[in-house]
UniProtKB/Swiss-Prot annotation:
The keyword Disulfide bond does not apply. Its EC number is 6.5.1.4. One of its GO terms (biological process) is RNA processing. This is RNA 3'-terminal phosphate cyclase. It comes from the Archaea. PANTHER family: RNA 3' TERMINAL PHOSPHATE CYCLASE, RNA 3'-TERMINAL PHOSPHATE CYCLASE. ATP binds at residues 105, 295-298. Belongs to the RNA 3'-terminal cyclase family. Type 1 subfamily. Pfam families: RTC, RTC_insert. It comes from Aeropyrum pernix (strain ATCC 700893 / DSM 11879 / JCM 9820 / NBRC 100138 / K1). It is found in: Cytoplasm. It catalyses: a 3'-end 3'-phospho-ribonucleotide-RNA + ATP = a 3'-end 2',3'-cyclophospho-ribonucleotide-RNA + AMP + diphosphate. HAMAP family: RTC (MF_00200). The active site is at 321 (tele-amp-histidine intermediate).
Length: 361
């Protein structure tokens, strides 16, 4: 399929969610391939584009100089004709508490192919339901991308929680690599350290401390390791956040990978449960022997499909998201192939990914 030929993606494939839309539009921008998506979120209620999806699509279009048709709330089809990915400074508002992390997922692949340094400021939710937390993106996602030769900086200026939002995050790519290295994630290597970051904003700092104690206690019990703990809390008169919220990230740094687990608080949910959930997520994934946790098992294949060469991954869980994205990559990226070597849906898995070696256009 030539770069000028339209690729048609059925948005109802697999789980049929917003991740198909975000990933397809990002890939179209990288590949310079016009894209038509039909049946957008057909399995969701209500179907069609929601405001947070529009932000991702419009951000990709702005940075790649692309044209959009059908980019409106409720639309079940969309056409995107990309231009060239340009560096510079951009600013996007995700809405009251739309996930900043999901916008970063959409933008990160194409920022690597920018023709010059690029900086993007995002306003919205940093720690919201149904998405990785911003700390996960900073400590795990960015670390894994660095192992693929891609340095992406994620700086949090202010957190934003549901429903108020108002978080501010700056994403910088000072030296776009123009592609990615193939790399296998099968062996973890020696454990170098475990870390806990617990935050509470517009709330007593004792909540952040209770979350951290709960997470750290479980890590000590299961791993026999004392984690390094960081508490983020604010005095009431110096707290810049718009609304209350809490969250925890627990992450483990190994010689060959980084893995993490996160959780966010909500009204009525004890702080101890928040901390325990984050630690349990990491510890469950570590117990499988995998080198990529459940979140990165979803996200890493996009970069490995664009990389030059063969990568083998051992992921903690082949989620429905990951399975759908692998099929989308096969449709959109000429030359990409994959094989599931072991495991299956919702189980630990090993996969071989043969990347297409995509270079800047």
């Amino acid at each position: 399929m030539g770069s000028g030929e339209w690729v048609v993606v059925d948005g109802s494939m697999g789980e049929g969610g917003g991740q198909i839309l975000r990933t397809a539009v990002a890939l179209a921008a990288v590949l310079g391939r016009p894209l038509r998506i039909v049946n957008i979120r057909a399995k969701r209620r209500p179907p069609g584009l929601r405001p947070q999806h529009l932000t991702a699509v419009r951000a990709v279009a702005a940075i790649s100089g692309g044209r959009l048709r059908g980019a409106e709330v409720g639309s079940t089809s969309l056409e995107f004709t990309p231009g060239r990915v340009r560096g510079g400074r951009y600013r996007f508002d995700v809405g009251t508490a739309g996930s900043v992390a999901l916008i970063i997922q959409a933008l990160a692949p194409l920022l690597a192919y920018s023709d010059s340094p690029v900086e993007v400021e995002l306003t919205g939710g940093t720690d919201v339901p149904m998405a990785p937390t911003i700390d996960y993106m900073r400590e795990v996602f960015a670390s894994i991308l660095a192992m693929l030769g891609y340095e992406i900086e994620i700086r949090v200026l202010r957190r934003g929680h549901y429903p108020r939002g108002g978080g501010r995050v700056v994403v910088r790519v000072p030296d776009p690599p123009g592609g990615f290295r193939a790399r296998s994630f099968v062996e973890r290597g020696p454990l170098k350290g475990v870390y806990v970051r617990s935050h509470a904003v517009k709330l007593p700092g004792s909540i952040a401390e209770r979350q951290a104690r709960s997470a750290a206690s479980l890590v000590r019990e299961r791993l026999g390791v004392d984690p390094i703990v960081e508490i983020e809390a604010y005095k009431p008169h110096r707290d810049p956040h718009l609304g209350p919220g809490t969250g925890v990230l627990v992450w483990a740094v190994f010689g060959e990978t980084v893995m993490g687990g996160d959780s966010i608080g909500k009204k009525g949910k004890p702080a101890e449960v928040v901390g325990r959930e984050a630690a349990e997520s990491l510890l469950e994934d570590m117990a499988t022997g995998a080198a990529l946790d459940r979140h990165m098992s979803d996200m890493a294949p996009v970069y490995l499909a664009l990389a030059g060469g063969v990568s083998t991954v051992f992921g903690a869980r082949l989620t429905g998201h990951a399975s759908t994205i692998l099929e989308l990559l096969r449709i959109m990226v000429d030359g990409f192939e994959y094989r599931i070597l072991e495991g299956g849906l919702e189980r630990p898995f090993k996969a071989e990914l043969r990347g297409a070696g995509v270079s800047p256009r």
